[in-house]
Amino acid sequence: RKLASEINAVTFAGIDWFVDSYRREVKNKAIMIVPNHWNTSLKSYSSNITYLGKNNPSNGEKMTIFHFDKTNPYTFSSDDNMYIIDSGEFGKIGFIICADFYDIERFVIYKGRVQHIIILALNKDTNSFFAISEAVARLVMCNVVICNIGQFGDSLAYSPYKKDYKRMIYRNQGANLFSTQVIDLPVK
């Protein structure tokens, strides 16, 4: 939160599971941090946090939750929201956490409504996400940005340009590559 305010940038970050021991539920969430003077020349001293949830657990999450306490099992608490974040002149952003990127219904809702889709991921199957990103960029006609954990690599930014050599804006391919990248995305 402090870093987002210091650099005056909207920041998305994955966080650990929320475990509700009373309800025996597990939630997978991310946070969006918006500094109070974002997109101005003023220095930000505080920020607002919004929690964004995940609808579909991955198979690995299902197994982890199942084995967590077999005598008194936990369940995954789904967040059915499909987020569209209005960032003003920078366009509207559809936000997705990991396995929700496989949810085709989401793209029908986002088509014509967003200029960007941002996916926070902890994904070993990076080739599937790469293939889906190209298809989604062309079907939804928006930029697709995948921010994968550095351990598995393959973060990328893909845009639906007509000329194929322009489509891949950024790709960090390979395991154990930790990086921060600033890129320009088209907004139409």
Question: Which role does the model predict for each range below?
Answer:
Residues 20-112:
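Active-site catalytic loop in hydrolytic enzyme cores
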